[in-house]
């Protein structure tokens, strides 16, 4: 079976700005693959090249064996797209929007069944402007699925949703895959990527730095633990840089974050800091996760926006 997506040395430039820089990867049928990275990393531009919304400046792309830059009507019926920014007329009702989109396809999904599956059947007669953020997202997902796509693109699906709505949307993504579709998604949310994705790619400054399973990405850090703590006053980097078994030290004001080769080191680290004067509080020790992978590969936290 051919890959659902094949990307080879893809670039997209805007004058001197390189938004996507030599990206290559493949996605197999039935996979959920996530791309993580901060705003401005190039994730959305990359997806738009795969969706046929932007033309690459270089390289090649095949999506379901078709070049998205030269799409056919039949190809468009095989993909579903949930854009990062989307809108509907405020006075359109949910059922009206569903009927409108269904009319564009020869063999659409049953709109009532789709709304039921997504948990918004009770809102079919509601105006879009009256829906909550989570309900609107479900409507946009329903519209993206109304053509029974083989491949679904989800761009920042849960941005600005409350925790309950976010978890509900995770169930929606799982149901999409259970229905046989392939999913390529972007997200800022490390928990979301870990919970949903078979493989995760780290994107920064237009480049795909790595793409692998979450266990493999975390294992690449070599084990150990992440230690976070607060100090009563700022601590010079030099206090911690010389400690054996300590790496990736990040000091931001009175917050210290570092990696240790052992979970038994916190007291030694605390002692080293307090010998210089500051007191230590709020010590947290945890196993490495995707945030640590991102920090190690890019040298910055996911929360440090471009």
What function would you assign to each model-found segment?
Residues 1-11, 300-306:
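ABC-family P-loop ATPase nucleotide-binding domain
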Residues 3-5, 12-204, 210:
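ABC transporter nucleotide-binding domains
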Residues 37, 248-251, 285:
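Hydrophobic/anchoring residues in structured secondary elements
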Residues 169-261:
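ABC transporter nucleotide-binding domain
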Residues 261-306:
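C-terminal coupling/interaction segments
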């Amino acid at each position: 079976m051919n890959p659902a997506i094949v990307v080879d040395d893809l670039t997209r430039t805007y004058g001197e700005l390189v938004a996507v820089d030599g990206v290559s990867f493949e996605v197999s049928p039935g996979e959920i693959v996530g791309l993580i990275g901060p705003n401005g990393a190039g994730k959305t531009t990359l997806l738009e090249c795969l969706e046929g919304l932007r033309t690459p400046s270089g390289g090649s792309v095949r999506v379901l064996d078709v070049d998205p830059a030269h799409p056919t009507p039949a190809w468009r019926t095989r993909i579903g797209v949930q854009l990062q920014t989307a809108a509907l007329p405020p006075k359109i009702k949910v059922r009206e929007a569903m009927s409108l989109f269904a009319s564009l396809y020869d063999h659409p999904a049953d709109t009532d069944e789709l709304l039921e599956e997504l948990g918004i059947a009770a809102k079919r007669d509601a105006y879009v402007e009256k829906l909550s953020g989570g309900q609107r997202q479900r409507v946009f997902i329903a519209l993206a699925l109304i053509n029974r796509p083989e491949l679904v693109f989800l761009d920042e699906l849960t941005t600005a949703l409350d925790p309950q709505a976010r978890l509900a949307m995770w169930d929606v993504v799982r149901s999409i895959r259970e229905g046989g579709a392939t999913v390529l998604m972007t997200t800022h949310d490390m928990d979301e990527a870990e919970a949903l994705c078979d493989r995760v790619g780290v994107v920064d400054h237009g480049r795909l730095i790595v793409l692998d399973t979450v266990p493999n990405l975390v294992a690449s850090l070599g084990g150990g633990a992440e230690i976070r703590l607060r100090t009563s006053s700022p601590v010079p980097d030099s206090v911690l840089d010389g400690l054996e078994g300590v790496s990736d030290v990040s000091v931001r004001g009175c917050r210290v974050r570092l990696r240790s080769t052992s979970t038994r080191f916190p007291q030694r680290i605390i002692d080293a800091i307090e010998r210089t004067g500051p007191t230590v509080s709020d010590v947290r020790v945890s196993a490495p996760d995707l945030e640590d992978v991102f920090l190690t590969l890019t040298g910055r936290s996911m929360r440090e926006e471009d």
